[in-house]
Amino acid sequence: MQKRQNLPIMCGTLVAINVIVYLICTFTGDLLYNIGELDAVAVLRYGEYGRIISSIFLHAGIEHLFNNMVILFFLGAMIEKVTGHIQFLILYLLSGIGANICSLFYKVIAMENVASVGASGAIFGLDGVLLAWILLDRRSMPDVTPKRVILMIALSLYNGFTTQNVDNAAHVGGLLTGFLLGALFCMIRKQKRNREV
C-alpha cells in the first residue's frame, strides 16, 4: 500500500489528460481553444470563468506540450510523494487558478487581450511549493538544496522573459500562489508533528 502511495499516479493522470486534450485539439481544430483558452473579455465581461481552469489543459503546440509535461512529471512526482495524490492535485489546480487570475489582472492593467493557454502557470506553482518547503521546512524535501531550486526558478523566469509569446504574469502568479500554498502546507505539517509529540 505504501509503495502504491509513493507512485506519482496523479502526475501521470494529469500528463495523460493533457496529452489526450491535445490530441483532441489536433482533430477538432480551434473548437476547444475557442471555448477554453484564457481570454480576458470572455472571462471578465461574459462570465466564462471555467476558462480559468480549462486553459491549464490546453497547449499551443507539441513543443509547448512536451516541455510542460516533462517538467510536470518529474517535478510533480517529487511533490506528490510528500503530499499524496489528492493534496497534490489541489496544490496543482489552485496554483493554476492563481496563475490565471494574475494573468487576467495583468491583461486588464496592460490593456491587452491576448488569449493564453498552458500548464506552465500551475507548474511554476509547484516550483513555489518546493521553494516554500526548502525555506520553511527542510524535512519535507531534505535531499533538495535551496540553491538548486532558486537557480531552477531563476532560469525558468529568465527564459520566459526573454522569449516572445509567453504569459509571464501567469508564471509569476503561479510561483507566488504556489509559495503561499507551500507555506500553508508547512504550517499544517508542523502542527501535526507538534500534536504527535
Language model features: what each stretch is:
Residues 1-197:
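A detector for small-residue-rich transmembrane helices and their helix-helix packing motifs
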